[in-house]
Regions:
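Active-site-adjacent structural elements in enzyme catalytic cores
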Residues: 1-207
């Protein structure tokens, strides 16, 4: 059965549509959704089967995943990661925004996401759709690129093209308008040195 192609207003998401997406996630669904950078693929982080499904779509072993996840705000982050005072100040300055922070994972991170590295990537995007989804779901959602790591092509930006590509692999593709071309900037905040792991859409000068 093909995925549902669901148009949602990017600035003022319709509550009934957000509820529909959340119901899908609670039922083990996998979605493709817009962010403040590129389109992402995700599921409820507490549904191991759904996480495994995302890993299969990405062509990786679940135990080898490096999935990040989306939180609604800074207080939500503190539930899943250990955050130093310096890291909190930096995140308060930069978030919501196009950044992924690598942090030490807390015990609340599901085992399937807590790889041997014991760290986790966390985002608070400056985009209403994913944050409203997370807020209503009351759980973070996985965020991983819809582009393969070894794919030399640019990130897909047209929601209709994205739907054509993933309609037989996911449950809902959200059309929130055209996506960006740059992924998030990744900052390692496991120490207070704050090293840039990957340059992306967010501007940040490492210490």
């Amino acid at each position: 059965m093909p995925a549902e192609f669901l148009k949602i207003h990017p600035q003022t998401p319709e509550p009934r549509k957000i509820q529909h997406v959340v119901d899908c996630l609670r039922g083990g669904g996998v979605i493709v959704y817009p962010t403040d950078t590129v389109y992402g693929m995700g599921c409820d982080i507490h549904n191991a089967r759904s996480v495994e499904r995302v890993a299969k779509i990405k062509g990786i072993k679940p135990q080898k995943n490096d999935f990040s996840f989306i939180c609604n705000d800074l207080s939500h982050i503190a539930d899943y990661a250990r955050v130093s005072n310096a890291a909190f100040k930096l995140m308060k300055k930069l978030l919501p925004g196009p950044y992924t922070f690598i942090l030490e994972a807390s015990n609340r991170v599901p085992k399937i996401l807590n790889t041997n590295k014991k760290t986790i990537g966390i985002r608070v995007p400056n985009h209403a759709i994913p944050r409203q989804i997370v807020l209503l779901l009351d759980n973070p959602i996985i965020t991983t690129s819809i582009k393969d790591d070894d794919d030399i092509m640019e990130y897909p930006t047209d929601p209709e093209e994205i739907f054509e590509r993933f309609q037989h692999q996911v449950d809902i593709v959200i059309d929130g308008g055209y996506g960006g071309l740059l992924a998030s900037t990744i900052i390692n905040a496991t120490t207070d040195d704050f090293a840039t792991v990957r340059e992306g859409a967010g501007v940040f000068a490492s210490n």
